[in-house]
Curated annotation (Swiss-Prot):
One GO cellular component term: cytoplasm
PROSITE patterns: CB, TYR_RECOMBINASE
UniProt protein name: Tyrosine recombinase XerC
GO biological process terms, semicolon-separated: cell division; chromosome segregation; DNA transposition
UniProt keyword terms in alphabetical order: Cell cycle, Cell division, Chromosome partition, Cytoplasm, DNA integration, DNA recombination, DNA-binding
Pfam families according to UniProt: Phage_int_SAM_1 (PF02899), Phage_integrase (PF00589)
Length: 300
């Protein structure tokens, strides 16, 4: 069974262009499924997977308290896997074809207020005044994530040549290997210049290659390190929600819309395939307006 899962993992990476994070999620979901199959049938085999068994698997997880979002993701993982197995001739009938994806309740993302975002940026900028390479790198991480709204995996995957400093744009390779160009402002440009001229040369080693961001040992920065940087930076801001890079992405999108940006432009900047995903941020701004109205209007 593991060899089949290895083949599916290769398909997700090479043909679907999924990130390592997404592929690990698929692998975890399918491993959990086949643990259940083996427990129920005594065989760890694709041939033993049936629609009733899949429904029992999801029902058991639901009864154990799995969130609706988790159930929806696992259903999607299984449906993608079974459809692939059918095309490869590994099964004659797709047992997941009629499996319904539970609708996940969409929750409004936690975002920073504008003043909180500026406080976080001020803090990370003040910490980079001494020329310490790690501080200069951390400044760039936060500035670039907020300026562009890119994903942390996209940030850590950037090479130096992906940055056009004269035009102040970054070329991003997003989900599905789709490339997009995202602009950034003067504060991020200043952070980038300081990192490239003062910070990166202090950490660079032959193994650094073209990577834009480096870890303390000179190799390409791991997304987990970038997440830690964002969490630590934001946690120092009084009253700010506990967010990481994805929360900073949410914040950038929300502030763009609050500033009057067109929804489809924001969709393009974020690399969303569906406009419906971007529209979630309009609900955030409406909720904020409602909160202000409730507090300030005498007839609220």
């Amino acid at each position: 069974m593991e060899s089949v899962l290895d083949q599916f993992d290769a398909y997700l990476g090479l043909e679907r262009g999924h990130s390592d994070h997404t592929r690990r999620a698929y692998r975890g979901d399918l491993t959990a499924l086949f643990d259940f199959v083996e427990q129920r049938t005594g065989e760890r085999s694709l041939a033993r997977v049936s629609l009733p068994l899949l429904r029992s698997w999801l029902a058991e997880q639901s009864a154990s308290g799995a969130a609706r979002t988790t159930l929806a993701r696992r259903t999607s993982s299984v449906k993608t896997f079974c459809a692939w197995a059918l095309r490869r001739g590994l099964i004659g009938v797709d047992p997941a074809a009629r499996l319904q994806v539970p609708k996940a309740r969409r929750t409004l993302p936690a975002v920073l207020r504008r003043d909180q975002a500026l406080d976080a940026l001020d803090a990370v900028n003040s910490g980079a005044q001494e020329g310490d390479p790690i501080a200069l790198r951390d400044r760039l991480i936060v500035e670039l994530l907020y300026a562009t709204g890119i994903r942390v995996s996209e940030l850590c995957g950037l090479d130096i040549d992906d940055i056009d400093t004269s035009r102040r744009v970054v070329r991003v390779l997003g989900k599905g290997n789709k490339q997009r160009t995202v602009p950034f402002g003067e504060p991020a440009h200043a952070a980038l210049t300081a990192w490239l001229t003062e910070g990166r040369p202090q950490l660079s080693i032959p193994e650094s290659g073209p990577a834009l961001l480096l870890g303390a040992r000179g190799r390409r920065l791991d997304p987990r390190q970038a997440r830690t940087v964002v969490h630590q930076t934001v946690s120092a801001v009084n009253g700010a929600p506990d967010i990481g890079p994805h929360g900073l992405r949410h914040s950038a999108a929300t502030h763009l819309l609050e500033g009057g940006a067109d929804l489809r432009i924001v969709q393009e900047l974020l690399g969303h395939t569906s406009l419906a995903t971007t529209q979630l941020y309009t609900h955030v701004t409406v909720e904020r307006l409602r909160a202000v109205h409730d507090q300030a209007h005498p007839r609220a």
